[in-house]
């Protein structure tokens, strides 16, 4: 009896017969979500991407109080009020330095991740969050606004590390059948973080002049929760196998995350990839940019991350309060209505996580950007005609909520998933460095340039973002392959024709397949290494 017959016999024993195969398949699908896998995703995201989202929105509510703090500190030091231009500059630095810190954190990920691993990188990263929380929370009592600015920078470093290390960790611990859904947890917790920042910023909670420092101090809570919980979970099994060559540790990690004792199939798949890459060192950013086997994967990641930041979602927040005001909503009620935007974000992200393994990455990404372009165009029209009829401002509100929902249902989380899926183990840290650099530089560019675009074009600025969304959707339609339920080798093959170069692991994969069929000895991977060497990858 060959291996396929044994597998079929085992399946029939588990399900009771051929007629119950589909039932057994469904049972195995539900077993993919083990308790340890769920805890790792929730705890990892709560102490990482949640904090990123929280720090995006937390500065909005206390803005007037922080500016008053800056002015008061300046007066005590210099004996005169701060110049308005200087105050604007200080506030711009306070907001935008978060992105600079994120870029620094992204550049640190490869070095830290190589020596510490994915899980330990997340644990060490909590040190940045705790120190930032203490600095920002104590800035008012110390009478030093520089502490708030430095804290924002350190919090940016935390975000840069988190948005690279967390997707890598989730990608490497999840079965490919639920890789997209688990990866979407990153985006869901970003949205929950944004909503939490809006909620805690209400005057009834922490959004008052005497309590605004505590808005920044609560950052310490998710960091402490992650520090207390994550050590009890294993390291990424792929990291243990590829970097530490710890097969026993990798097997235990697979058993923990998959919730079953027999992980021979998963371990063999990882070992097969490990044999191909066993003599390959970690690829540098420059080497990855030069590699012909991944040229279009790199281009796609760059365009995906640039579209993620430049699609105009951040610009929506600049118009929200004015649009709500023109719709007749009292000024003191606008913060409560703004909570609806955070709620829509969270619900749309959860929806995406539920359907991503059914619909795939391509439809959600293309459809999300396409709908954003449509609603940006409609929003431009309603803002231009808002004085023509009393109901037009309400249509603007609908457009804003629709843009947010369209973004979070696809473009808001899929870029992080694709970055992990496109690249093999030795390339993944460099790929996340490239993706993170584009992400944070684009974030900084939007914060720096949007006020000038808004001043020049007014409401027509949304046509710029509509154009970017259309360009992104068009690119993904023609270039992006579906990655749902595909292995790395299959995804590489999907790009091979466009790259005009076969991925180096294909020869070894083919050889190993032939070996299993003919019971031959394991092929040497020297041909693979030669192929990498000829193309200057190693």
From Swiss-Prot:
Organism from which the protein derives: Mus musculus
GO process terms (BP): D-glucose transmembrane transport; urate metabolic process; urate transport
Post-translational modification as stated in the protein's UniProt record: N-glycosylated.
Record-given protein name: Solute carrier family 2, facilitated glucose transporter member 9
Cytoplasmic side: 1-34, 110-120, 171-181, 234-297, 357-362, 419-429, 481-538
Family, as annotated: Belongs to the major facilitator superfamily. Sugar transporter (TC 2.A.1.1) family.
Glycosylation site list: 55, 71
Main location: membrane
Gene it is expressed from: Slc2a9
Composition skew (Polar residues), residue ranges: 518-538
Membrane-side (Extracellular) residue stretches: 55-88, 144-148, 201-211, 320-333, 386-390, 454-458
Recorded topology in the membrane: Multi-pass membrane protein
NCBIfam families named in the record: SP
Spans through the membrane: 35-54, 89-109, 121-143, 149-170, 182-200, 212-233, 298-319, 334-356, 363-385, 391-418, 430-453, 459-480
Keywords from the named record: Cell membrane, Glycoprotein, Membrane, Phosphoprotein, Transmembrane, Transmembrane helix
Region (Disordered): 495-538
Compartment annotation: Basolateral cell membrane; Apical cell membrane
List of residues that carry Phosphoserine: 3
Gene3D superfamilies hit by this protein: MFS general substrate transporter like domains (1.20.1250.20)
InterPro entries given in the database record: GLUT (IPR045263), MFS_dom (IPR020846), MFS_sugar_transport-like (IPR005828), MFS_trans_sf (IPR036259), Sugar/inositol_transpt (IPR003663), Sugar_transporter_CS (IPR005829)
Top-level taxon: Eukaryota
Tissues in which the protein is found: Highly expressed in the intestine, with high expression in the jejunum and ileum, the segments of the intestine that perform the majority of urate excretion. Isoform 1: Widely expressed. Isoform 1: In kidney, expressed at low levels in proximal tubules. Isoform 2: Primarily expressed in liver and kidney; with specific expression in distal convoluted and connecting tubules of kidney.
